[in-house]
Amino acid sequence: MPLPIWLIPVALKGAAIAAGAAGAGAAVRGAKKMKDADDTMKAAKSRHERNMAKFKKENETTTKDMDKLGKLELEILHSFSEFSDVFEQIKNRPTFETYSKNGVSLPQYDGEKIKEVSVGAGVLLGGLGGAGLGVAGGFAAAGATTAAVMALGTASTGTAIASLSGAAATNATLAFLGGGALGGLAAGGAAGGGMAAGAAALGAATLGVGLLVGGIIFSVTGGKLSDKADEAWAQMAKAERKINTICNYLVDLRSTSNKYYETLFKVNGIYKRHLNGLKSIVTMLGHTDWNTFTPEEKTLTENTVLLVGLLYNMCKVELVLKSKNENDINTINKVAVETSISNANAVLADKF
C-alpha cells in the first residue's frame, strides 16, 4: 500500500540515514584497508632495509678478511725473490729431493718457477693500492699462485700484463682469470668495490636483481596501494630467504678464510725466520760454497727450501670453486683448505 503523503518525507529521511550509515561503514572499512595496506608496505620496506643492512655488513666483513688473506698470499709469493737471490749464490748445492712423507708431497725446488711467481705477485701487489675493496680477496678465491702466474700472461689487447702498471695490470689479470672463480670480479671492482669479492665468492648472478626488492613498489600510494602491499611483502620475503642464504654462506666463507689465514701466517713466520738465518749465513758470514756449510747450516737451508715449497702449495689453493650454474652460489673449497692445513701441520710437526 502506498505511504500517505505526509509520511513520504520521513521515509526518505530514514532511507538517507540508512544509506549514509552504509556509506560511512564502507568508508571506515576502506580507510582501514588502506591503513592496513600502508602498514604492510611500511613493514615490508623496513624489514627489507634491515635485511640489506645485514647483507652489506656480512659482505663487507667477509670481503675485508678475504682481502687480508689474498694480500698475505701475494706478499709471501713476492718474498720468494729474496729467497731466490740468496739461494742462487750458494755454489755446489745439491738437488734437493721432493718431500714425500705421511701422505704429504711437496714439489721439487724449481728456481725459474719461483722467480716467475714472485715477479707476478709483485705486479699484482703494485696494483692493489688503486684497486677496489675485494680484489685481493678475489685472488685468494682463485688461488694467488695461479693469479701471480697469470699476471705474466698477455692481456686481451696483446700487451704483456707485466709491462702494465698498477691497477691496469691488476685489472688485466682479473680479466684473464675471468672464466674461473673470478667471473664478474673486474666489473664488480670498478662498479662498487665491496661487491667485487662477493661476485667472486658467490657468483655474479647471485648478487643480481633477485637479491633486491625494487624501490618503486615501496613508493606506491593511493588506490593501487592495497593491491601492491601484499606483492611487496611477498617480494620482501623472497629476497629475505635469498639474503639469509647468502649471509650464511659469507659467514662460512669468512670462517674458512680466517682459519686458513692463521695457518698460513704461522708457516710464513717460520719461513721468515729461516730466510733471515739463510741470509745471515750467505750474506753476513759469506758462506757461499755448500761444501763448507756446517750440518746445521745445511739443515737450515734444506728446511728453508722445504718451506718455500709448502707455502707455494698453500697459495695455490682455490678457496672458492665456481658453480657450473651461474644462478647458484659458488662452493667453498673446504676439502682442499682442510687438506692444505693438515699437510702444513704435518710438515711442521715432522721438521720444525
List each model region and its residues:
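Glycine-centered secondary-structure boundary/capping sites
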Residues: 85-92, 178, 336, 340
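Amphipathic, membrane-inserting segments
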Residues: 46-98, 198-199, 204-330
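Extended, low-complexity, charged alpha-helical tracts
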Residues: 29, 36, 40-43, 47-54, ...
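Proline-rich intrinsically disordered, low-complexity coils
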Residues: 2-4, 9, 94, 107, ...
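Glycine-rich, hydrophobic membrane-spanning regions of integral membrane proteins that mediate transport
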Residues: 101-122, 134, 138
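Small-residue-rich hydrophobic membrane-insertion segments
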Residues: 1-29, 123-222
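N-terminal amphipathic alpha-helical segments
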Residues: 16-45, 222-235, 239
